[in-house]
Swiss-Prot record:
GO terms for molecular function: 23S rRNA (guanine(2445)-N(2))-methyltransferase activity; RNA binding; rRNA (guanine-N7-)-methyltransferase activity. Belongs to the methyltransferase superfamily. RlmKL family. It comes from Marinomonas sp. (strain MWYL1). It is an enzyme of class 2 (transferase). SUPFAM superfamilies: S-adenosyl-L-methionine-dependent methyltransferases. Its main location: cytoplasm. This is Ribosomal RNA large subunit methyltransferase K/L. The keyword Lipid metabolism does not apply. The gene is rlmL. It comes from the Bacteria. Its EC number is 2.1.1.173, 2.1.1.264. It is found in: Cytoplasm. It catalyses: guanosine(2445) in 23S rRNA + S-adenosyl-L-methionine = N(2)-methylguanosine(2445) in 23S rRNA + S-adenosyl-L-homocysteine + H(+); guanosine(2069) in 23S rRNA + S-adenosyl-L-methionine = N(2)-methylguanosine(2069) in 23S rRNA + S-adenosyl-L-homocysteine + H(+).
Amino acid sequence: MSTILQTTDSASQVYALEITCPLGLENVLEKELHGEGLTQTRLGEAQVKLTTDLEGMYKACLWSRVATRVMLPIANFKMESADDLYDGVKAIQWSDHMNASNTIAIDCHGTNHHIRNTQFGAVRAKDAIADYFVALSGERPSVEKEQPEVRIALRIKREVVTVSIDLSGESMHRRGYRQQGGMAPLKENLAAGLLLRAGWGTDCGLTQLIDPMCGSGTFLVEAAMMSLDMAPGLRRPYWGFKGWKQHDHRMWQQLMDFAKNRKKDPATLGIRFQGTDREQKAIAAARENIKRAGLTDVIDVTMSSFQEHEFDINPDAPGLLITNPPYGERIGDEMALIALYRQLGEWVVTHVRGWQFMMLTSNDHLARQIPVRPEKSTRVINGGIECRAYQFPLLAGSIKEDVVAQSVMTPGAQMFANRLQKNAKKLKKWVEKNKIQCYRVYDADMPEYSVAIDIYGNWAHVQEYQAPKSIDPEKAKQRLFEVMSAIPTALNISESNVILKQRQRQTGKEQYEKFDQTKHEMIVEEYGCEFIVNLKDYLDTGLFLDHRPVRKLIQDKANGVRFLNLFCYTATASVHAGQGGARSSLSVDMSNTYTEWARRNIELNEFSDRYHQVERADCIEWLKQSRDKFDLIFMDPPTFSNSKKMADILDIQRDHGELVRLAMARLARGGELIFSNNYRRFVLDEALEQEYDVKNITRETLDPDFDRNDKIHQCYIIKNK
């Protein structure tokens, strides 16, 4: 049997409302309601319960910036079977709330043993309401999912069902100024709640507001609406109570008229609202939203980074800086954002002392890059992601200099920085003497910091080795953050020039994995040769640094030779051969990507494609079919490959004997094969040493940046006896 919660005596009827809001902002909502004279409240989880009359109900709808929905519970009942749901809904006096001619929609939330999916629950409730009106008048309401005249909410919690009228009709974050679709920005009611939590509001005493990464401008618009005392519900074209039978149109219109008159004149406001964003789409959306909100003369937004933009700041007036920077969904994204968060912290400390500062982020590691300890934080949910809104004390005007100047590096990061500086110092003379631009400065020297760091000019390329399953992922993540925070200081490299990739065991096509479709290329030099490298788009960069001495050896041996480069990758060895005076070169690889890259490297160094050719082919099949002879052959096959382009699976330990013999068959009299591979447990087939003159030159092909790891590759010179 239904317990009826609301009746329809008169306009003086008292209603017990449930006003929902973003989790974590319940206190803010309650304070907001009290400010409108709605004081009979009780806090709940993600809601405030309000007892009020019809006018108070309208005020909550019209003036609440933080509320998500205003719900009017009309009945609750116990449900012990699916039939109980039907019976309980049908027992409600629906004629008190609507007519049979109204359109309805039913939202069902929650399930139990009897109602296992929400769609079934909504259908049973709809049938009950239809049957109620058929029995009463012979008519039934029709269903309208989008903007019905009466929206009904069904909440199932364990064995109890609560039935409510959704007076808001749809989420109250929809103010009417933001176009739906496209970008998925911060919701308006969450933005408003955070602004209120940060101390912003009508007549709050703050006269400047900046959002340095403003996106579609939600913080700016909501803040301006508060300062102008604009009712957030004033522009909404749709409300759920307009089809409700107890709606008083005259009272609502009077409250609307009062709200319009309450709005302040923007010309007398005296408050600056400024925003920047680097994305053209974001700024275009912000400008459109600002225009639709009628705030074009109040808010200034510019397409620019906050670092480069000159904000109009009054140093003697208090203000609020509030922003929702990117969080980084993937670990690589997070690492790239370290620089952005540091720059934000430094900019705030430098430019807006004495202000309030709030930052919303889901990533506490990134939050720690702000060089100030947060005073407090609020847990909220933004777009399904758990976040925290951090409030920083520097901005109260009493910040201590040692807090601002404190290093953002943890003891672990400082220890890692010390190791990097030690390694760099050890390599410095060798780098300068040989004019080395690209070299390895660190390779998992400390087991707990399992990364390889390569220098490419003024860039650092970081590869994280995949941690064993025994390592706590959070601990591994923390150590990686320490690595990334240490590199800029230790190696004197801009934070924005530190690139991270995650390395793991490669199989098949993953060896050629592309990260995105944008080319991020640069040109580097090595012993008179120029190479195109790409630090961002692929797992590898286009230049194997450990083979630097092998390439130099090829250059020294290449004068007048016919050179063959098998499994050529980007043909850097062929370029060295050309630089050394090779008569001709042929570079063979099965990858479309790398053969095209190889051609570009050869063209970059101005070698004629008539004499220095690139061919896409399965190297094993090519060797079986070729009858050409070469004076110098370089063969650096992968450890493993199962590409569909190959006739068979390649396993270098198992197959290297056949490969070497095929290559040796292509050697001219007196020629040499340089055979290398990167399999750390590689053992050369003893039969090859019986058949050929084999010399292990691995030690001679390790430069100082790789001499800590004699397993980085295995290299041999093989000649016919």
